[in-house]
Amino acid sequence: MSEPHFKVIIVGGSITGLTLAHSLHKIGVDFTILEKRATVTPQEGASVGILPNGARVLDQLGLYGLVEEATAPLGATHIHFPDGFHFCSLYPKSMLDNFGYPVAFLERRRLLEVLYNALPDKSKVLVNKTVSDIEQCEDGKSAGVKVRTADGDVYEGDIVVGADGVHSRTRSELWRMSSSAGQSEDVRMEKARMSAEYSCVFGISRGPSGLKAGEQIMRMYDGRTLVVIPSKDDVVFWFLSRKLGKKYKYSEAPRFTLEDAAAECAELADAPLGNDVRFGDVWKIRQTFNMVVLEENLLRTWSFGRVLCIGDSIHKMTVNLGQGANCAIEDVAILTNLLSQCLGSKREAKPSGQELDALLRRFNDVHLSRVSHIYDTSWLIARVHARDGFVRKIIGRYVMPYFGHKFESRPFNMIANAAALEFLPLPRSSFPGWEKYKSKEDKSGSWAVVSRSVLLLVGLAILSTWWRRA
């Protein structure tokens, strides 16, 4: 009697979870998605940015065409400072020219619709399924995982992948099992890494705004950043991030109401956006909005036995760099590649629990260095945009406008070195950036080099002033 098919239980019908489902289908792996909400396409007022590294994987899966149709590609970013200075960056156009994919923003709900509607078998997506606990077993033929839901149902598979976001239930179960195995101190350290220093009001407005589609506006204030992204069909995406009064532990992070969000936006109602348009005008045509705390975490251990977490559950970033969803899509690519290699070599029998534990640890080892680089860059960019500290103000005001093009290769390295699905053709690979910037990624923290350079320049300027006065 032949072995039953290998099966993955995916917790979370998120962008990450649905993309994983498509990838698993491509290699013939069965799956079930357990989503706690009543729908996989909720309206939460959020947009999502798809950059070339995420776009390429979606393109490999045959999904990017619908994403592209829903967006107006960014061609420029207009950046404004408190002293009235502003400049225009053509970085978004340069990214398109180099990689063949634009910086594209669309409604998060629309992307979820694209991913869900394209699934070959939607019966594998189950809603109103809140995970209560996960059990692992290595007892002969019954080896595998059991996932219990709050309604009493049990779902069996070979591995569990938590794609259930920053408030991950899967992560909690992973930590519970790790603690039971004598790793309580490691779990304590992981929990301590989770914090929040920023809040964000994000929203979607609809109607004539007077703003040009594809031209992003960013206004940088001390402790705040306002970003407005006019898109096609008179849709405007926007977000307002703000540094909180202190750094919060994840478990103590504040919650916000819609009244809090409205008050936050009212403070910047007079912020000019160009063409005699102010942020208050965009606010007046709002369709939906929300306010959340922006958690930040980069965990070091992503798996235990047959249980793995991916996406925001292990690497949550601020919104400024726009790599959150794209990094999660890369998680999917690397995991699917490893599963494809492992299952292809097994032929008749399934991998043992020991082999799967090693595979998931391998995923962690392979990907952690790159994710760390992206996370560190995102961490710094958020603080440069918020003018948080003297050196970061100097970087934003004087380095970015005049020397930003010199550092353009840094984010391009990040794109070119991205993971893709190894078993599918690479679309748009003829664009020069994929080869030009590949394998030149500076994982030592290129922006740290910029910071040190700025400090040196400031120090020399102070010494020069002192010398002239002496």
UniProtKB/Swiss-Prot annotation:
FAD binds at E35, G49, R108, D312, A325. FAD-dependent monooxygenase; part of the gene cluster that mediates the biosynthesis of the diterpenoid pyrones higginsianins A and B. The first step of the pathway is the synthesis of the alpha-pyrone moiety by the polyketide synthase dpchA via condensation of one acetyl-CoA starter unit with 3 malonyl-CoA units and 2 methylations. The alpha-pyrone is then combined with geranylgeranyl pyrophosphate (GGPP) formed by the GGPP synthase dpchD through the action of the prenyltransferase dpchC to yield a linear alpha-pyrone diterpenoid. The keyword Signal applies. Belongs to the paxM FAD-dependent monooxygenase family. One of its GO terms (molecular function) is FAD binding. The keyword Membrane applies. Its cofactor is FAD. The active site is at R193. Glycans are attached at N128. This is FAD-dependent monooxygenase dpchE. Its EC number is 1.-.-.-. GO terms for cellular component: membrane.
